[in-house]
From Swiss-Prot:
The active site is at H88. Catalyzes the formation of 6,7-dimethyl-8-ribityllumazine by condensation of 5-amino-6-(D-ribitylamino)uracil with 3,4-dihydroxy-2-butanone 4-phosphate. This is the penultimate step in the biosynthesis of riboflavin. Keywords: Riboflavin biosynthesis, Transferase. Belongs to the DMRL synthase family. This is 6,7-dimethyl-8-ribityllumazine synthase. InterPro entries: LS, LS/RS, LS/RS_sf. CDD domains: Lumazine_synthase-I (cd09209). It catalyses: (2S)-2-hydroxy-3-oxobutyl phosphate + 5-amino-6-(D-ribitylamino)uracil = 6,7-dimethyl-8-(1-D-ribityl)lumazine + phosphate + 2 H2O + H(+). 5-amino-6-(D-ribitylamino)uracil binds at F22, T56, F57, E58, A80, V81, I82, M113. (2S)-2-hydroxy-3-oxobutyl phosphate binds at G85, T86, R127. PANTHER family: 6,7-DIMETHYL-8-RIBITYLLUMAZINE SYNTHASE (PTHR21058:SF0), 6,7-DIMETHYL-8-RIBITYLLUMAZINE SYNTHASE DMRL SYNTHASE LUMAZINE SYNTHASE (PTHR21058).
């Protein structure tokens, strides 16, 4: 049995962080956490680019363009959708999730999602590093691991049909 796994060593990886400006009190903390996680896993600061878009709904379009450049091994989407009094929360959350998943399926690189979908600002801040860890950092670490597993798959020897 051959096992292919990604490592959490990001040395030599090029990464992009795509961050929504809306709910910036939360998204800036996600960005700080993601950048710190990349650094801790060996990705050089000079190998990380940050792209900002207006809101979380716009993330998939920007992700698609960033991925299409072919310059990155790992791309991380960062945003926050906070429930309000209308069904807008459900629509945005669902469409962003579908959009990021679609980009990830078609990408030739690792694409991960650090988008919070929370019931309150307090809950979002907790998940952005105040109490419950930083989901931006988690998404960045997952991107490093995913980039490495994709590299391992690309290097795997071809098997002859029996």
């Amino acid at each position: 049995m051959n096992v292919y796994e990604g490592s959490l060593v990001g040395t030599g990886l090029k990464a992009a962080l795509v961050v929504a400006r809306f709910n910036s009190l939360v998204t800036e903390q996600l960005l700080v956490g993601a950048a710190d996680a990349l650094r801790r896993h060996g990705v050089a600061d000079g190998d990380v680019d940050v792209f900002r878009c207006p809101g979380t709904f716009e993330l998939p379009a920007v992700l698609r363009r960033v991925v299409a450049t072919g310059r990155y091994d790992a791309v991380v989407a960062l945003g926050a959708v906070i429930r309000g009094g209308t069904p807008h929360f459900e629509y945005v959350s669902a469409e962003v999730t579908k959009g990021v998943a679609h980009v990830a399926m078609e990408a030739g690189c690792a694409v991960t999602m650090g988008v919070l979908t929370c019931d309150s600002m307090e809950q979002a801040l907790e998940r952005a590093g105040v109490k419950a860890g930083n989901k931006g950092a988690d998404a960045a670490a997952a991107a490093v691991e995913q980039a490495n597993v994709l590299r391992a798959i690309a290097r795997a020897p071809a098997r002859k049909a029996e």
